[in-house]
Amino acid sequence: MRKLGFAITMLVAFAVGPAPLAQSAEGFAKALHIYDNYRVVPNITYLTANNWDAKLDVYQARDAKGPNPTLIYFHGGGWVQGSKEAASLTFLPFLEMGWNVVNVEYRLGKVSLAPAAVQDALCALRWVYRNGKDYNVDTGRLVLMGNSAGGHLALTTGMIPASAGLDSLCPGTEELKVAAIINWYGIIDVNELLAGPNVRNYAIAWLGGMSNRDEIAKRVSPLTYVRTGLPPIISIQGDADPTVPYSQNVRLHQALDNAGVGNMFVTVPGGKHGGFSDAEMAKVYAEIRGFLDKQNIARLSAN
């Protein structure tokens, strides 16, 4: 009954979601394909904060043999909206590759302001480290991915060191290392979005009226943590993105180059904030697969 309820929730999320695919028969068909062909363990509580249970879903091929590479996915929505259920089609290509997927929800701004979402994402990664063996997860081949605010969270989760103190809600001794980060048009410099020509209402809403918001914004900005030794990072963005300034990801990859971090920046010419064509998506996923192959991440376990 629990899984049936989850399937219905997922289908409803697609039906009311913002993406055109979510409103189409194709979207429903793909949602049913996921439910029919993959084992889904839904709504596992990985953290309780602000009297709110943060949950995640684990997806696996029904005939999975492990341990296998695993994608940890964070949905978008400007840190103030969105849901994990409405994002499931985004990571379908990884399921088709035989990967496990961990689909994470986190505290939105209406529950708790920044840096809550960043803290939650770090706790989700720690949960995977502690529980992954129960789901055939190869913790040596963890890849973080997200779009927009989720891209930001994928970056912060893979870049923020323990010394930053942002994992205080789930302390532990595990070194939270990941094999790669896939950033779809994520926010790189939160401070830049709080004032000036690139101000964005969603960033202001996430930081609220806190007196130290500039300090918090810097603490949760991926650009703050660029340094030697980071995992390889691939970013994807349209150069006509009206929601997240394209220049932010240009700056990120310039900084990664300067730090000697393996990286790749895939630009979609004329692309907006997602909504890329099928042909563009095919090219992007070919680039992602090639990038992961170079890191020796994509292969499945032979066990």
List each language-model region with its residue ranges.
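Bacterial N-terminal signal peptides
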Residues: 7-17
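Alpha/beta-hydrolase superfamily serine-hydrolase fold, recognizing
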Residues: 23-303
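Positively charged n-region of N-terminal signal peptides that target proteins for export
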Residues: 1-4
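Sec/Tat signal peptide C-region and signal peptidase I cleavage site
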Residues: 18-22
